[in-house]
Amino acid sequence: MGKKVAIIGAGVSGLASIRSCLEEGLEPTCFEKSNDIGGLWKFSDHAEEGRASIYKSVFSNSSKEMMCFPDFPFPDDFPNFMHNSKIQEYIIAFAKEKNLLKYIQFKTFVSSVNKHPDFATTGQWDVTTERDGKKESAVFDAVMVCSGHHVYPNLPKESFPGLNHFKGKCFHSRDYKEPGVFNGKRVLVVGLGNSGCDIATELSRTAEQVMISSRSGSWVMSRVWDNGYPWDMLLVTRFGTFLKNNLPTAISDWLYVKQMNARFKHENYGLMPLNGVLRKEPVFNDELPASILCGIVSVKPNVKEFTETSAIFEDGTIFEGIDCVIFATGYSFAYPFLDESIIKSRNNEIILFKGVFPPLLEKSTIAVIGFVQSLGAAIPTVDLQSRWAAQVIKGTCTLPSMEDMMNDINEKMEKKRKWFGKSETIQTDYIVYMDELSSFIGAKPNIPWLFLTDPKLAMEVYFGPCSPYQFRLVGPGQWPGARNAILTQWDRSLKPMQTRVVGRLQKPCFFFHWLKLFAIPILLIAVFLVLT
């Protein structure tokens, strides 16, 4: 057998890692704290310590064609944006199809991962686990950390003077499950992220009054984009990424703001970000603008202080008679089973080469899978990360020197600050990142060659959605069905909506989509050229 690999967590990152290890002839053992797979997507009625937690009404923000495993499309009849139960159903089907369950030890908690005494030469790890009160230790050749980054809630109570005097209920959004207990209540939601907006709009149907407090604002996008197509199938494209990264900054910024304001003017709704040109991940919510218009949700600035029954905002206004405060303030990054010397942090930034490998170890035998965030979906990202990591562990891929890795990290971090802002330390440019990882393992599609040999496919790959299938077209792990999956992705996207057929299916024309978006800039450039 190949090298023994410990995998911590059986969510989508863990399952992708098991599968990638098997593809490379490695011997995986996955440790899962709970009694089931799915991680974040496995709903539970109560938030469990040390596990990700979601509320009952969670739907995906990525559409099914953009968030699947690259060789395992969602069923045709699944909706484009899915309830968490549908995604869990898909995850279970994937695990069974790829025969992954037998490699998982359930109800097993990883208490510590330490360097083996001869780590400098072998790269091995001592992994200690607990099950039914019994501790066991084993030596592994490598470790893949797949425990996610939505586990440990960030609850900055010290940032809110007077909160200790507040007499109502106060808790983090991970403990929120459903709206029933808030009937007739006055609720303040702190934080304008996806969870905060979802919870606020859901509560607005039953609560007496709901307010959202936001320190810096946010762009709010709809899942439904031009002509009713899923947003990511129109916006997450190679051509769009090329334009975004090569247009003059002023034009790129103008187009970005115009695109974000296409549905409604954020200034009018109190949602406008403090720095609107930063490419921070937007919030996806189809109901918030209507809730604000109807007066059942109000947006307020940051909370200056709390009293026993109210919140005083920085603009001097007061929300009185509050029954409950829900902090949708994100999560902290933590790996309590690892020594801090293994995965280092700097200014609240986890230092990882390409978001995967700690750069300062003698041997690169530990990888963090799933510790990035972008406009792209998690599943295809962790699939590529784990494939690369498995090849590095096997020895078929090599990493640069420590110095080169640190230089790359510093350079990328500076770009991230300029592009996404100081607080978005795990944000990344999806297609650029995916191309980078796929190039390491020989799986990056060769676009010029495709235009010469298969122009029909090339047009869809370059101008159409950058779907996960593209990264199983060539190289190790190549999937024979990838070409057909790309050419039929719009059929699968439109299929679940055809419950009342009224005419021929209309697929988008990307030429007119991009022409519409760039019509004004093209006209301005033309006028400038004529005048000069």
From Swiss-Prot:
Primary gene name: FMO3
The organism's taxonomic lineage, starting at the top: Eukaryota, Metazoa, Chordata, Craniata, Vertebrata
Name of the protein in question: Flavin-containing monooxygenase 3
Effect ascribed to mutating N61S: In TMAU; more than 90% reduction in catalytic efficiency toward trimethylamine, benzydamine and methyl p-tolyl sulfide
Function: Essential hepatic enzyme that catalyzes the oxygenation of a wide variety of nitrogen- and sulfur-containing compounds including drugs as well as dietary compounds. Plays an important role in the metabolism of trimethylamine (TMA), via the production of trimethylamine N-oxide (TMAO) metabolite. TMA is generated by the action of gut microbiota using dietary precursors such as choline, choline containing compounds, betaine or L-carnitine. By regulating TMAO concentration, FMO3 directly impacts both platelet responsiveness and rate of thrombus formation.
Modified residues (Phosphoserine): S401
Family stated for the protein in its record: Belongs to the FMO family.
UniProt xrefs under Gene3D superfamilies: FAD/NAD(P)-binding domain
Residues binding NADP(+), per UniProt: S60, N61, S195, G196, C197, D198
